[in-house]
């Protein structure tokens, strides 16, 4: 052991290394803790609120070191807080957080508020503020926190079934669906927080999360002697920024036996890895499946060098730089929206699944293992914040000496998340009509009508504000309706009521997407990943990761049916013509192929949009239509033209024509390719139907299928039914763009407007039209048949 250096020698060595030249940052300034950007924003907001309070009370010159003014300030804060979920009452915890943010923010900029003063204000919030609120207003300070909710396996499966088996939302990239499910499964299986594999909102723009260089992937021979894939993930856990060596590690794997494929985390993760060509020594799925590891060892699969610094869960949004890590903000919004679509009024959160995961880890493992799994340092954190109030014990069974049961408590824990499988995704037509009569809503529409076409900055800003207010009103009414919506399961297991419009979309369009069509079935089968069913699902997920759009072409309108030369084939270049709900674009020009094939066919030919077959000859077309009419199950329930993925998925049909036996079959099944002519046609037939109805009888739904045999007391209720169940938006008023086109045509005939000006006017109003897209606007008169006549 070398001799210990003297003090002079010790510092001499430091001076030789440049100690005396390093003077920057050596001063008498107080060094403060470096919080996250999110925390700093919270501090700054509270200091600015104090400045506003002081400005409002400038006549008394309030001081933050005066207890009287601090109490008054925090009282004003409590009155100003908006409660959660339509509850106007502030929560004690929220007021306390605001107070702590204020004291922390003030301490960073000025002399700290004395500890006795801060403690007194804290006690004021707990003991005196509730009485002041109750005495001086109708508010009360809510002391209890929201009850802990638990994302049980059933809720996990409900989300999975919606995402893969019935989802009508089209993401910007098909890979988003795979990445989201992979991230969700990783979070669920490791009881992670939302920002530990992807970029947390508290660490915005930090790029922190899970990267390939921190991931270990291998193949081993399992207990049954079979090769099995496994992956180890490292969580960037909360509170471990300065102790990265302590971060929890979690392993996920294929599994030993049969399981529903939707529950296999290796399925979406392996799809991502294969699509990304992440492995250094293996480039295809077949090569990976052929690996035979040695007994008792894990064969490490190395990553490519150029992928080590890439995130495992990357963003697929065009709004972020390609390859950047996904953000908790974006992922959380999509998960929340998925929850609404699944039927939850209050959708499950990542933390709900974390709570359920920790519940099971606590039951099956030691306290030390649970703490490491959770990324917690205090053993009481679980008991205080995650342990269910229903401890899972069976007092009845244990007392009477019966077999103890756990299923009852598990199911009750699942009830902490309420779900309605038929939760409406939009207001019913009757509710929309009631909303239109609301004075606040009507005032917004009147002002929007006045601002239509005005392009000055002030009008544009005001219009955006009004549209936001309008959306807020609609959302508020929708939430009210959802809370009162009946939730009664049918004893037969079938839905007694017609499904809402949105829940029928996927079944109408799934034939356009072979991969999603197959996954909607295979993922819910019980199999292993290496079975034929599992490999089919894996290959379909890989295809989604590699695809630019979910819809490549429409069956019946394949690209080869275009008769043009290759150089003259029209392709869409950008999102500009027929668009989906996300303004996505398919390069497949279905309309050109449809017209081109018809034009170049000898004689009459028509595409049946119900069965995707071309029928040649008028007689054969008539008989084909007759065959559909004799088979009511083949007739569409929703009869509006539906564009999905940039192509026409289903043509529009008239419910009145379909039921009119006096017409020829081809007239009864007339196909509308555009919404405008379809709306005009159905509206005119509806008016004729009303005039011909017998005023003494109930009005029947004209749909010829066996799906619906409803009858109604009034024409208004029939119209509501048609809008909800069969002909969405057929009475919708003209859009802003349609109104402007009519005005331009009139001005053109009068010679008042030039073509270039018309183009400018059209471009100007397209923004208005975009804002009001999909916002149903109805004009109803609820009248009886006798009144209508």
Regions found by a protein language model. Name each.
Residues 224-225, 603, 695, 751, ...:
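Intrinsic-disorder/low-complexity loop/linker signature
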Residues 1-590, 602, 759:
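Extended, non-catalytic subsegments within catalytic or DNA/protein-binding/adaptor domains
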Residues 6-7, 502, 508, 515, ...:
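Intrinsically disordered, low-complexity serine/threonine-rich regulatory regions of eukaryotic proteins
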Residues 575-610, 614-703, 711-743:
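C-terminal recognition-helix end and immediately following basic linker
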Residues 566-568, 658-661, 705, 767:
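Extracellular/secretory pathway and lumenal proteins
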Residues 562-564, 571-584, 626, 671, ...:
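Low-complexity, intrinsically disordered regulatory regions
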Residues 318-319, 704-708:
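Short, internal active-site loops enriched in acidic
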């Amino acid at each position: 052991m070398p001799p210990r250096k003297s003090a002079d020698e010790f510092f001499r060595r430091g001076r030789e290394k440049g100690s005396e030249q390093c003077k920057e940052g050596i001063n008498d300034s107080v060094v403060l803790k470096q919080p996250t950007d999110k925390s700093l924003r919270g501090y700054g907001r509270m200091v600015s609120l104090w400045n506003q309070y002081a400005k409002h009370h400038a006549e008394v010159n309030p001081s933050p070191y005066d207890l009287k003014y601090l109490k008054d300030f925090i009282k004003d804060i409590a009155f100003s807080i908006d409660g959660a979920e339509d509850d106007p009452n502030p929560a004690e915890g929220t007021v306390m957080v605001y107070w702590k943010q204020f004291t922390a923010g003030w301490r960073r900029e000025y002399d700290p508020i004395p500890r006795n003063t801060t403690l007194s204000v804290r006690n004021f919030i707990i003991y005196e503020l509730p009485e002041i609120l109750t005495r001086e207003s109708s508010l009360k300070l809510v002391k209890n926190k929201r009850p802990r909710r638990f994302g049980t396996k059933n809720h996990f499966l409900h989300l999975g079934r919606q995402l893969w088996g019935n989802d009508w939302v089209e993401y910007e990239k098909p890979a988003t669906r795979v990445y989201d499910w992979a991230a969700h499964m990783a979070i669920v299986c490791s009881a992670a927080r939302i920002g530990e594999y992807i970029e947390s909102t508290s660490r915005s723009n930090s790029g922190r999360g899970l990267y390939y260089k921190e991931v270990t992937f291998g193949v081993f021979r399992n207990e049954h002697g079979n090769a099995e894939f496994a992956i180890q993930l490292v969580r960037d856990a909360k509170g471990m920024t300065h102790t990265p060596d302590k971060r929890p590690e979690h392993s996920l794997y294929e599994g030993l036996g049969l399981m529903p494929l939707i529950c296999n985390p290796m399925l979406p993760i392996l799809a991502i890895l294969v699509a990304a060509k992440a492995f250094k020594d293996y480039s295809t799925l077949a090569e990976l499946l052929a690996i035979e590891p040695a007994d008792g060892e894990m064969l490490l699969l190395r990553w490519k060098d150029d992928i080590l610094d890439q995130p495992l869960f990357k963003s697929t949004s065009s709004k972020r730089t390609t390859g950047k890590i996904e953000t908790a903000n974006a992922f959380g919004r999509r998960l929340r929206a998925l929850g609404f679509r699944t039927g939850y009024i209050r959708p499950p959160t990542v933390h709900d699944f974390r709570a359920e995961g920790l519940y099971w880890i606590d039951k099956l493992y030691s306290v030390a293992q649970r703490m490491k799994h959770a990324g917690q340092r205090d053993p009481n954190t679980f008991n205080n914040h995650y342990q269910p109030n229903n401890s899972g014990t069976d007092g009845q069974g244990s007392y009477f000496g019966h077999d103890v049961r756990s299923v009852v408590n598990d199911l009750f824990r699942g009830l902490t998340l309420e779900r309605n499988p038929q939760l409406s995704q939009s207001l019913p037509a009757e509710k929309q009509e009631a909303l239109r009569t609301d004075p606040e809503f009507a005032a917004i529409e009147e002002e929007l009508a006045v601002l239509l076409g005005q392009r000055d900055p002030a009008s544009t800003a005001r219009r955006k504000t009004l549209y936001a207010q309008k959306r807020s009103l609609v959302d508020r009414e929708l939430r009210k309706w959802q809370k009162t919506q009946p939730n009664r399961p049918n004893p037969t297991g079938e839905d007694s009521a017609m499904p809402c419009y949105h829940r029928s979309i996927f079944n109408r369009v799934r034939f356009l997407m072979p991969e999603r069509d197959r996954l909607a079935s295979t993922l819910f089968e019980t199999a292993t990943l290496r079975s034929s069913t599992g490999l089919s699902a894996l290959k379909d997920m890989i295809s989604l990761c590699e695809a630019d759009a979910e819809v490549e072409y429409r069956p019946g309108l394949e690209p080869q049916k275009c008769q043009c030369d290759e150089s003259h084939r029209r392709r869409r270049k950008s999102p500009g013509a027929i668009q989906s709900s996300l303004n996505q674009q398919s390069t497949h020009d279905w309309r050109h192929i449809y017209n081109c094939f018809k034009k170049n066919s000898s004689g009459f030919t028509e595409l049946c949009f119900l069965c995707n077959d071309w029928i040649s000859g008028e007689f054969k077309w008539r008989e084909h239509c007759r065959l559909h009419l004799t088979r009511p199950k083949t007739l569409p329930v929703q009869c509006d033209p539906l564009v999905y993925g940039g192509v026409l998925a289903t043509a529009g049909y008239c419910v009145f024509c379909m039921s009119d036996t006096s017409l020829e079959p081809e007239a009864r099944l007339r196909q509308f390719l555009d919404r405008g002519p379809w709306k005009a046609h159905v509206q005119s037939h509806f008016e004729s139907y009303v005039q011909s109805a017998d005023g003494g009888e109930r009005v029947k739904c004209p749909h010829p299928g066996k799906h619906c045999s409803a009858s109604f007391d009034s024409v208004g209720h029939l119209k509501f039914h048609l809008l909800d169940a069969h002909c969405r938006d057929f009475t919708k008023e003209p859009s802003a763009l349609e109104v402007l086109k009519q005005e331009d045509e009139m001005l053109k005939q009068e010679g008042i407007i030039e073509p270039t000006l018309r183009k400018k006017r059209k471009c100007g109003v397209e923004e208005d039209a975009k804002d009001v897209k999909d916002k149903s606007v109805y004009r109803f008169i609820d009248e009886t048949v006798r009144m209508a006549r």
